[in-house]
Swiss-Prot record:
Organism: Caenorhabditis elegans
Role noted for this protein: Transcription factor which controls spermatogenesis and sperm cell fate by regulation of sperm gene expression.
Sequence ranges assigned to domain SAND in this UniProt record: 65-150
Localization per Swiss-Prot or TrEMBL: Chromosome; Nucleus
Signal peptide (residue range): none
Highest taxon above the source species: Eukaryota
GO cellular component terms attached to this protein's record: autosome; nucleus
Biased amino acid composition, Basic and acidic residues: 192-210
Full protein name: Transcription regulator spe-44
Pfam families: SAND (PF01342)
Molecular functions per Gene Ontology: DNA binding; DNA-binding transcription activator activity, RNA polymerase II-specific; metal ion binding
Length: 424
């Protein structure tokens, strides 16, 4: 990029590199050390800075050597950057916080901002503009996270808009160790919870426990909420001991008779009739125990699923006396009879209003039809009658004229006035 061999070595210049190079971290940094190999090119000093990484560094990615050009005078030092197929030089003293809209990249005779530089390199669709700009084989974000490149005088000129990724205020070693220990404790707690959950279901199956998949880690910042474990008393063999208070005594068995399978099951759990008896006769006791053990939500889900199935059955099939009684009992059990009554009244009101609306619409249609018939039919009949009357009067007048002429008696020719033929 610079037209010279970077590996060529020469004598170090006498002036230090700390005066005008505030945009990058030079030697003497607490976290990174560097070895510099300068060479001469077109009366400018170009240094290849190699940054090492300590053992406890939080950035394990390798960073390519950073080539910084130190011009003579007060000009800004530059580093070669690229974006796609476009190459340029970033002026470190012009790279100010937050950087995205600061003209600091020289491309030919233009001074572009990083945003304009990514647009020219056809990388504007990427959300992370720092990752789109390359400094050698590493991205600009990698160098900024490693503190090899920073905004110019960032401590004094920070705009407060650069904290989105929090790479400027790098966490200290104590904070990193606390985060690692927290993640380790969270992973251990999650593993302990999974083992406790699996212990109740697969206690007698060690092979399944070994072949179980490991749980994936949760995102940073998430908190593992403690699960509601079932409160089982280890010294009590029976889970719900209150179920046995009103239970009838078991039938006596002969000493020679071996216990049946039902008796074996009764030792493991409460008999079916005892639980059903408690559910029907002592619901307060039953549901209190369900709430205390943390399993009452499962029964509520079962009730909801049963209600959905009942709804689907009623909508798809004709109503039977069984389903009708079930719906009525459910409505009264849930305390919604007033809601049902109000809903029926609302449906009736809507039907009545619709019926009145239809009647009003029909009346309007009939009225308009009558007005239309009255408006056009009388005019046609009156005009025809007037025409007929006029024709009759005209005929009568003609007939009268003819009759009057015919009534005259014949006069002798001597009494008649001479006509036009006699005029000389």
């Amino acid at each position: 990029m610079f037209g010279g061999d970077v590996s060529a070595a020469s004598v170090l210049p006498s002036h230090p590199i700390s005066g005008s190079c505030d945009g990058f971290q030079a030697e003497g940094s607490d976290h990174h050390h560097s070895t510099m190999t300068p060479f001469q090119e077109s009366q400018r000093n170009v240094y290849q800075i190699l940054y090492g990484h300590p053992a406890n560094d939080d950035f394990p990615r390798p960073i390519t050597p950073l080539q910084i050009t130190i011009p003579e005078g007060d000009a800004s030092p530059t580093v070669p950057v690229s974006c796609g197929v476009v190459n340029g030089k970033m002026h470190l003293n012009l790279f100010m916080c937050p950087g995205i809209h600061q003209p600091c990249i020289e491309v030919g005779n233009d001074l572009l901002s990083p945003k304009q530089f990514t647009i020219r390199g056809d990388k504007e669709r990427q959300k992370d503009w720092k990752a789109s700009i390359r400094v050698g084989r590493s991205s600009l974000r990698t160098h900024m996270e490693a503190m090899t490149i920073d905004f110019y005088e960032h401590m004094n000129r920070c705009s407060g808009k650069c904290q989105s990724r929090n790479y400027v205020n790098a966490p200290s070693e104590e904070v990193l160790q606390a985060r690692k220990s927290k993640r380790t404790s969270e992973a251990g707690q999650l593993k302990y919870e999974i083992e406790n959950e699996m212990a109740g279901k697969e206690a007698d199956n060690d092979d399944n426990r070994k072949s179980a998949k490991k749980a994936r880690g949760r995102p940073r910042g998430s908190v593992n909420k403690p699960r509601q474990m079932v409160k089982m008393e280890p010294q009590d063999d029976r889970f719900f001991e209150e179920f046995f208070i009103d239970a009838p005594p078991l039938q006596s068995m002969s000493s020679n008779e071996e216990p049946t399978s039902s008796n074996k099951e009764s030792n493991e759990c409460t008999p079916f009739n005892d639980i059903l008896n408690c559910l029907q006769n002592d619901p307060m006791n039953f549901w209190s125990q369900m709430q205390q053990t943390g399993v009452i939500g499962h029964f509520c889900d079962d009730i909801i699923v049963s209600a959905i199935n009942l709804k689907q059955s009623v909508m798809d099939n004709p109503v039977t006396p069984t389903t009708a009684n079930m719906l009525t009992r459910t409505a009264f059990a849930l305390g919604i009879p007033p809601v049902v009554v109000h809903r029926v009244q609302s449906i009736e009101r809507n039907a009545y209003q619709q019926r009145k609306h239809d009647e009003m619409f029909n009346d309007i249609q009939s009225t308009l039809a009558e007005e239309h018939s009255v408006k056009y039919q009388p005019r046609t009949s009156s005009s025809s009658q007037e025409s007929l009357h006029t024709a009759r009067e005209f005929t009568e007048e003609k007939v009268e004229e003819l009759i009057d002429v015919c009534k005259y008696d014949d006069y002798p020719e001597s009494e008649c006035l001479p006509g036009p033929s006699h005029i000389q």
